[in-house]
Curated annotation (Swiss-Prot):
Principal subcellular localisation of the protein: cytoplasm
Entry EC number(s): 2.3.1.234
Protein name: tRNA N6-adenosine threonylcarbamoyltransferase
InterPro entries registered for this protein in UniProt: ATPase_NBD, Gcp-like_dom, KAE1/TsaD, Kae1_archaea_euk
Gene Ontology biological process terms in this record: tRNA threonylcarbamoyladenosine modification
Record-linked SUPFAM superfamilies: Actin-like ATPase domain
Catalytic activity: L-threonylcarbamoyladenylate + adenosine(37) in tRNA = N(6)-L-threonylcarbamoyladenosine(37) in tRNA + AMP + H(+)
Pfam families named among the record's database cross-references: TsaD
GO cellular component entries: cytoplasm; EKC/KEOPS complex
Binding-site residues for substrate, renumbered to this chain: Y130, L131, S132, G133, G134, D162, D183, S262
GO molecular-function term, one example from the UniProt record: N(6)-L-threonylcarbamoyladenine synthase activity
Coiled coil stretches, renumbered: none
């Protein structure tokens, strides 16, 4: 089985190709929109994705050394995400499905992150941290679905850090030589400032932390503010994670999503793993951020269980939660 996956939920237009036997991932091509200033504007995302989609599709097919006719199914991330960006991927998927008579497979973006994590880390039964620009979720698989034990009550961890570095003119670009701008700034910081620390059970709130940190700009050294906001945010996440570990008794902790690439977070998680006797499984950097390969792979799993959608019913779902998705391919 060969499945072509299309990702366009936010700043990345990605096309991946997966097959149902090793090495599983045959291609993982993408192009990421980087705004010259400010945040991501939906109209700019739509224009970018529409302009690069054809090129990325061709590159993926060339990388896999196959033609579109060799593909069995078309998988597409229908949500969650930014509406105009989602529509580009959905439109491309529908066009390919109709033109080449290929069945369409609906994929939840978060499930894509989680399933590529299972594949690349070889985790068996983990507690999962799904950390990205749009999501901060603590979950695990139980009785047919991924059940959420904790999540952000407002903005996501990744988004909070992106907004801060943008507001203080440290970004864009957000990632420099594999490091987030807040990590680079934090390297010269050492003073832990007083900032809000909000954990409610296994849920977290980052909006107050962001607001308070921005109010300190000009009053404290920027390096100390970066250091403090990062340390406090990560410690909040770790406290909520420890509670979930105590509740579930899991012996594996899998981290997926763009924030999984953070070296500083990795160090904290390794310490937590030693303390709790838990194996830490972190998705490789090339699959941490948004990508088409994860959509192709999750789509392959879904297709293997007959999960398809009619083209005329393939609506985008900007607020589609991972705990709303049935997972028939997992026992």
């Amino acid at each position: 089985m060969l499945v072509l996956g299309i990702e366009s939920t936010a700043h990345t237009l990605g096309v991946g190709i997966a097959k149902d036997q090793p090495p599983y991932i045959l291609a993982n091509e993408r192009d990421t929109f980087v705004p010259k200033e400010g945040g991501m504007k939906p109209g700019d995302l739509l224009k970018h994705h529409a302009e690069v989609s054809g090129t990325i599709l061709r590159r993926a097919l060339e990388k896999a050394n196959i033609s579109i006719n060799d593909i069995n199914y078309i998988a597409v991330a229908l949500g969650p995400g930014i509406g105009p960006a989602l529509r580009v991927g959905a439109t491309l998927a529908r066009a390919l499905s109709l033109k080449y008579n290929k069945k369409l497979v609906p994929v939840n973006h978060g499930i894509g992150h989680i399933e590529i994590g299972y594949l690349t880390t070889e985790a068996k039964d983990p507690l999962i941290l799904y950390l990205s620009g749009g999501n901060t979720i603590i979950t695990t698989f139980y009785k047919g679905r991924f059940r959420i034990f904790g999540e952000t009550l407002d903005i996501a961890l990744g988004n909070m850090m992106d907004v801060f570095v943008r507001e203080v003119n440290l970004a864009p670009p957000y990632i420099i030589n594999g490091k987030h701008a807040i990590d680079i700034c934090s390297e010269k910081g050492s003073k832990l400032l007083k900032l809000p620390y909000v954990v409610k059970g296994q849920d977290m709130s980052f909006s107050g932390l962001l607001t308070a940190a921005l109010r300190l700009v000009g009053k404290e050294k920027l390096e100390d503010i970066c250091y403090s906001i990062r340390e406090i945010a990560f410690d909040m996440l770790l406290e909520a994670t420890e509670r979930a570990l105590a509740l579930t008794s899991k012996k594996e902790l899998m981290i997926v999503g763009g924030v999984a690439a953070s070296v500083s977070l990795r160090k904290k998680l390794e310490e937590l793993g030693k303390e709790w006797d838990v194996q830490i499984k972190i998705v490789p950097p090339e699959f941490a951020g948004d990508n088409g390969a994860m959509i192709a792979y999750a789509g392959m799993l879904a297709a293997s269980k007959g999960v398809f959608i009619d083209v005329d019913k393939s609506y985008i779902r900007p607020r589609w939660r991972v705990d709303e998705v049935d997972i028939p391919w997992r026992n």
